[in-house]
């Protein structure tokens, strides 16, 4: 009897354990079913989103890349997990656009330039630049008549020419200092004496009040007292010059904004000056040999005829005729089917209308156009290729086809 009771108890314990294990298995099965349903819902949701994207205009979606192949991991990121839906992305984009538009409007209102402000800017630049030119470009050792003539020349010349002359002066001064480091103290003493004498002598000869001239000289050259070498640095000169111009203007503009505005309206070539003279062309050729057709900024500066570096480069190309031997590249067109048009529209709606290299990759992977392109390439002989030198650019052809399809659909809707 005792043995039978023990066996019965053991069987009861085993039965309880089995029941518990079965309950756990049932719960696991339920959880698995729930997970499968959630996955099915998520897949259906993403499928519907892709359908909506294909029907709408192109939007940007970040594709995950692995060995130069795009796959369905575009909906998954390792750090973040599943990225937000397209609706959330569109909301974020709208808010960013609103903020950017507000910022643009605010900046435009803050930095608005009127015609009066621009005229005043040109006047202040002209006056202050001529003061600096009288200080830097007129030597102390010259006679009184020569100084007056130089001052007249400075007053008649344009600001662009004065800037280039001051830059050349700084370059020469720096070159001399590299060779003669021992004579720095003597040169600085002579220039400091020029501050007091040069401006005062000009004022006496030109019948201008002496007290005003002295005040202006003190205001302009107040920074020379602390540093001796800093006044012969063009960068420091430009900073001080444009800071002074911005202080004199009534409109609250920075020195950089004043400089940009003056360069935009002042430093462009006149319509009358488009034709190049023989002297300019000869000088340009000499300077291009000197600088080995590279440093076009220095070439334009040494020309000293208000020519920009880009115009100097273009003129040099016209003279040497560098681009005559190169034949024009001809674009071959690809024929499209109706099915290919649909594929192209879907791909552009997913990838976007800017990354045409990706569009080309996917279109070629569908094996729709590649067979025709290969046939057309094999039909061409080797000698015909050398004569014609045709170039096939698939990206441009896909882009053109997509734009034509969009224009056709828009016309149909209208």
UniProtKB/Swiss-Prot annotation:
GO biological process terms, alphabetically, are:
positive regulation of DNA-templated transcription; regulation of DNA-templated transcription; regulation of mitotic cell cycle
Applied use: Possible candidate for an effective malaria vaccine as determined by epitope response in sera.
The Myb-like domain, residue ranges: 242-266, 268-320, 328-381
Q: What GO CC annotations are associated with the protein?
A: nucleus
Can you name one GO molecular function term for this protein?
Answer: DNA binding
Subcellular location(s): the record lists: Nucleus
Which UniProt keyword terms apply here? Activator, DNA-binding, Merozoite, Nucleus, Repeat, Transcription, Transcription regulation
- Pfam families with a match to the protein in the record: Myb_DNA-bind_6
The superkingdom of the source organism is Eukaryota
The record ties this protein, via SUPFAM superfamilies, to: Homeodomain-like (SSF46689)
Gene inactivation phenotype reads: dsRNA causes reduced expression, alters parasite growth and trophozoite to schizont transition during the erythrocytic cycle.
Q: Function, please?
A: Transcriptional activator. Has a role in the parasite erythrocytic cycle where it directly regulates key genes involved in cell cycle regulation and progression. Binds directly to Myb regulatory elements.
**What's the name of the protein?**
Myb1 protein
Q: Which organism is it from?
A: Plasmodium falciparum (isolate 3D7)
């Amino acid at each position: 009897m005792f043995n039978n009771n023990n066996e019965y108890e053991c069987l009861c314990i085993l039965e309880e354990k089995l029941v518990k294990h079965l309950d756990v298995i049932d719960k696991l099965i339920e959880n698995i079913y729930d997970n499968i349903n959630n996955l099915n819902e998520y897949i259906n949701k993403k499928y519907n989103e892709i359908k909506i994207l294909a029907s709408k205009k192109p939007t940007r979606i970040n594709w995950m890349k692995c060995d130069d192949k795009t796959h369905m991991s575009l909906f998954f990121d390792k750090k973040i997990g599943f990225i937000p839906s397209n609706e959330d992305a569109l909301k974020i984009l709208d808010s960013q656009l609103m903020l950017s538009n507000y910022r643009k409007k605010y900046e435009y209102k803050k930095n608005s330039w009127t015609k009066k402000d621009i005229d005043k800017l040109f006047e202040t630049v002209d006056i202050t630049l001529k003061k600096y030119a009288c200080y830097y470009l007129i030597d102390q050792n010259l006679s009184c008549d020569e100084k007056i003539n130089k001052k007249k020349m400075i007053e008649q010349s344009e600001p662009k020419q004065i800037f280039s002359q001051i830059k050349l002066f700084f370059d020469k001064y720096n070159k001399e200092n590299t060779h003669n480091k021992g004579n720095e103290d003597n040169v600085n003493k002579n220039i400091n004496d020029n501050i007091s004498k040069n401006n005062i002598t000009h004022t006496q000869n030109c019948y201008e009040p002496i007290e005003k001239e002295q005040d202006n000289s003190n205001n302009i050259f107040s920074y020379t007292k602390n540093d001796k070498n800093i006044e012969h640095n063009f960068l420091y000169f430009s900073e001080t010059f444009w800071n002074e111009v911005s202080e004199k203007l009534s409109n609250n503009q920075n020195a950089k904004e004043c400089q940009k505005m003056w360069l935009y309206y002042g430093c462009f070539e006149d319509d009358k000056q488009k034709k190049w003279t023989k002297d300019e062309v000869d000088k340009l050729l000499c300077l291009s040999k000197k600088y080995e057709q590279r440093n076009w900024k220095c070439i334009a500066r040494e020309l000293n005829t208000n020519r920009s570096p880009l115009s100097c480069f273009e003129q040099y190309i016209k003279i040497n005729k560098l681009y005559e031997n190169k034949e024009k590249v001809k674009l071959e067109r690809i024929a499209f089917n109706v099915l290919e048009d649909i594929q192209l529209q879907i791909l552009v709606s997913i990838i976007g209308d800017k990354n045409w290299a990706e569009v080309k990759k996917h279109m070629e992977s569908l094996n729709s156009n590649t067979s025709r392109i290969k046939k057309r390439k094999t039909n061409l002989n080797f000698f015909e290729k050398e004569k014609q030198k045709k170039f096939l650019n698939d990206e441009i052809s896909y882009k053109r086809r997509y734009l034509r399809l969009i224009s056709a659909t828009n016309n149909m809707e209208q």
